[in-house]
């Protein structure tokens, strides 16, 4: 009985190990924004010694990296200029994983208290210079609603 159990358990572990797939951190996923005109760090995990190929929809350049003994891998990819065109990144270790609907651009994080409640037009004695022209021109830019 024990011999059958251990044989079955060993088979199950070998089978599960053979099905390793690129794992990515939660910060990398569909619908993300990547920094424009830079080198973006991409990383993840896979079976130790596995070659992971990375391809981006905005470039013909292919990247290849081999996982370390701990299964970790990392690569830097060149990113395009800002655009509203959806992009994708494909990771391939023999089983493809693709991240879709990625935009290249800037993400600004603003924090504050009372200074964060100022309207675009400013306050009574503190107007924002040129705000009305900026608001009118905003509609000419794709993606500004």
Model-derived features: positions:
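Flexible, active-site-adjacent loop/turn segments at secondary-structure boundaries
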Residues: 22-26, 30-32, 97-100, 114-118, ...
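Secondary-structure boundary elements
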Residues: 114, 118-145
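Bacterial Sec-dependent N-terminal signal peptides
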Residues: 1-23
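Non-catalytic, glycine-rich low-complexity segments
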Residues: 19-48, 102-110
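A generic structural signal for short, non-catalytic loop/turn and secondary-structure boundary residues
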Residues: 17, 92, 102-103, 137-139
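Intrinsically disordered, low-complexity boundary segments flanking structured domains
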Residues: 9-13, 96-97, 129-136
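Extended acidic/polar, glycine-enriched regions
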Residues: 43, 47-126
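Exposed boundary/loop context
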Residues: 5, 10-13, 37, 64, ...
């Amino acid at each position: 009985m024990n011999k059958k159990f251990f044989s079955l358990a060993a088979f199950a572990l070998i089978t599960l190990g053979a099905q390793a797939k690129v794992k990515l951190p939660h910060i990398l996923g569909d619908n993300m924004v990547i920094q424009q005109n830079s080198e973006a760090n991409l990383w993840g995990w896979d079976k130790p010694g596995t070659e992971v190929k990375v391809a981006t929809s905005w470039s013909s350049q292919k990247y290849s990296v081999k996982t370390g003994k701990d299964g970790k891998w990392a690569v830097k990819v060149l990113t395009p200029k800002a655009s509203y065109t959806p992009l994708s990144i494909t990771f391939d270790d023999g089983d493809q994983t693709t991240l879709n609907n990625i935009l290249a651009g800037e993400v600004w994080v603003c924090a504050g208290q009372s200074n964060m409640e100022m309207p675009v037009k400013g306050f009574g004695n503190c107007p924002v210079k040129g705000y009305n022209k900026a608001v009118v021109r905003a509609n000419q830019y794709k993606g500004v609603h």
